[in-house]
Swiss-Prot record:
UniProt keyword list: Cell inner membrane, Cell membrane, Membrane, Sugar transport, Symport, Transmembrane, Transmembrane helix, Transport
Job of this protein: Uptake of L-rhamnose across the cytoplasmic membrane with the concomitant transport of protons into the cell (symport system).
Residues passing through the membrane, by range: 4-24, 38-58, 68-88, 101-121, 131-151, 175-195, 214-234, 259-279, 290-310, 321-341
Pfam families to which the protein is assigned, alphabetical: RhaT
Family stated for the protein in its record: Belongs to the L-rhamnose transporter (TC 2.A.7.6) family.
Native organism taxonomy: Bacteria, Pseudomonadati, Pseudomonadota, Gammaproteobacteria, Enterobacterales
Membrane topology (UniProt): Multi-pass membrane protein
Disulfide pattern: none
Keyword Methyltransferase among UniProt keywords: no
GO MF term list: rhamnose transmembrane transporter activity; symporter activity
Species: Salmonella typhi
Origin: domain of life: Bacteria
Catalytic activity: L-rhamnopyranose(in) + H(+)(in) = L-rhamnopyranose(out) + H(+)(out)
Predominant location: membrane
Name of the protein this chain belongs to: L-rhamnose-proton symporter
């Protein structure tokens, strides 16, 4: 396996670790509605950071975006909005299925859809079917799904042992939302694929290869921001017991603390895709769609490890932890199989 591929896998791991940890600061926010907290974090992660980073990278910010016609920008924006819909459905999936089953089904579907639909759309699926490297990467995807399934099972055992249940368990509604979440969340993978002309234009301006994907985030995350912030603002305006005015009428130290914690959560959310761009840049072009598989499987891996570090599994017993450990090992094996496939 080449050093470039190894570093690509490593950066995807770092990005996934940030994704697994980003909600920790949000959990420390006090006396704010979820909608206000999510909006503040989202403004940082989807608007302020993408625009700021792009302004620092590009020699002429407005000229760069002005060179693209609507046929280039609109698919990138709409795929970003598609991801935004999946993001909202994610929370509802947890509500009706519980954390473990919801995450397992949603992540499994988005891993398959986001990874395999891209080469199909690009007309490159024959690379997977007719080459040795393609066979290896497909095997890696299959093994990753097994790993996700094992971690999901560990989570179910933990929830059963600790008496944790879904807020409003509804299998039919939860499965529908999980499928929708999985499909729509893959919009981020499709957006990265549609944004290739933007990446090439950034490279032509002399932007370092590690950073060429970052300017496209202004458009991708703009689409996601429209859906997420629109959802939050509508709820803040219409739901009777929600009030942004009340959230900002607390004691000043608490408001400042909540803003900083929400902003930190937003920063950590953004960093997952900052390092995703670094990893993506190191993956061979013919296998660039495997970035999504690496990111999502590592997200499950890191989520399990973070849970262990934070002692969320302390009272779960030995069997759930053993099953979790097995799932993490399988995901690591899957990443190595994919790496070997890309190198062959």
């Amino acid at each position: 396996m080449s050093n470039a591929i190894t570093m690509g896998i490593f950066w995807h791991l770092i990005g996934a670790a940030s994704a697994a940890c980003f909600y920790a600061p949000f959990k420390q926010v006090k006396q704010w509605s979820w909608e206000t907290m999510w909006s503040v974090g989202g403004i940082v992660s989807w608007l302020i950071l993408p625009w700021t980073i792009s302004a620092l990278l590009l020699p002429d910010f407005w000229a760069y975006y002005g060179q693209f016609n609507l046929s280039t920008l609109l698919p990138v924006f709409l795929f970003g909005a598609m991801w935004g819909i999946g993001n909202i459905n994610y929370g509802l999936t947890m509500r009706y299925l519980g954390m473990s089953m919801g995450i397992g089904i949603a992540i499994g579907i988005t891993l398959i859809v986001g990874t395999l639909m891209t080469p199909i759309i690009n007309g490159n699926f024959d690379v997977l079917i007719h080459t040795e490297g393609g066979h290896m990467t497909l095997l890696g995807v299959f093994v990753a799904l097994i790993g996700v399934g094992i971690v999901t099972r560990a989570g179910q055992l933990k929830e059963r042992k600790m008496g944790i249940k879904a807020e409003e368990f509804n299998l039919k509604k939860g499965l529908l939302l999980a499928v929708m979440c999985g499909i729509f969340s893959a919009g981020m993978s499709f957006a990265m694929n549609a944004a290739k002309p933007m990446h090439e234009a950034a490279a032509a301006l002399g932007v370092d290869p590690l950073y060429v994907a970052l300017p496209s985030y202004v458009v991708i995350m703009g689409g996601g921001a429209l859906v997420n912030l629109g959802f939050c603002f509508i709820r803040l305006a219409k739901v009777q017991n929600l009030s942004i005015k009340a959230d900002f009428s607390l004691a000043r130290p608490l408001i400042i603390s909540n803003i900083l914690l929400s902003a930190l959560g937003g920063l950590m959310w953004y960093l997952q895709f900052f390092f995703y761009a670094w990893g993506h840049a190191r993956i061979p072009a013919q296998y660039d769609y495997m970035s999504w598989m690496l990111h999502m499987s590592f997200y499950v891996l890191c989520g399990g490890l973070v849970g262990l570090v934070l002692k969320e599994w302390k009272n779960a017993g030995r069997r759930p932890v053993a099953v979790l450990s097995l799932g993490c090992v399988v995901i690591i094996i899957a990443a190595n199989i994919v790496g070997l496939g890309m190198a062959s």
